[in-house]
Regions:
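A membrane-topology feature that recognizes alpha-helical transmembrane segments
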Residues: 1-185
Length: 185
């Protein structure tokens, strides 16, 4: 049957529209905007799912990673694109590899869904450069760690409590994309 992910269709659509409008304002009429506008609804959906069930399903994360790589490859062929497709692919490998190392060090501390999500976010952030990749990835880690600290300090969670980390990764990557787009403009 249907599953309730805690966010109704109207708030999810409003959030998606707001994020798309912000990215459109930052990116302008460049080819990569179409890619970001296709990825945003998936990011919002992944955020809702992860917050509800602490899981990032393969049915969303894997096609999202492949789609981002292929679509940015097409965007790179068009005039006025502001990024680098080879660097985007390397960014996916670097961020995905970094999260894989974190997962291997502590499988109970990092879900494998986060590793797969990192592939997509690395591709997207890598498009605009290594600095953008670092800022977006670090912002996600910092936001997640701060939220985890708040939960522990308010005794709403302990050190071993599972926490949805994907939403923070996505939020950090979104901030990185906006900064990258503005810097490329």
């Amino acid at each position: 049957g249907e599953r309730d992910y805690g966010v109704g269709p109207v708030p999810a659509a409003a959030l998606t529209a707001l994020v798309c409008a912000g990215l459109a304002a930052a990116v302008g009429a460049r080819p990569e905007l179409a890619v970001w506008l296709l990825l945003v609804p998936l990011g919002v959906l992944l955020t809702a799912v992860d917050l509800a069930v602490n899981r990032l399903p393969d049915v969303l994360t894997l096609p999202m990673a492949g789609g981002a790589a292929v679509l940015l490859g097409a965007a790179a062929l068009l005039p006025h694109s502001a990024g680098s497709w080879p660097r985007a692919l390397l960014g996916g490998a670097v961020l995905g590899g970094g999260y894989l190392v974190l997962f291997l060090i502590s499988p109970s501390g990092m879900g494998f869904g986060d590793v797969k999500l990192a592939l997509t976010l690395g591709v997207a952030l890598g498009w605009y450069g290594w600095g953008v990749l670092f800022v977006g990835a670090f912002a996600g880690l910092l936001l997640g760690c701060c939220w985890g600290a708040v939960l522990v300090l308010t005794r709403r969670a302990g050190r071993g409590t599972a926490m949805a980390f994907g939403p923070f990764m996505i939020l950090g990557a979104g901030a990185g994309l906006v900064l990258g787009a503005l810097g490329a403009g």
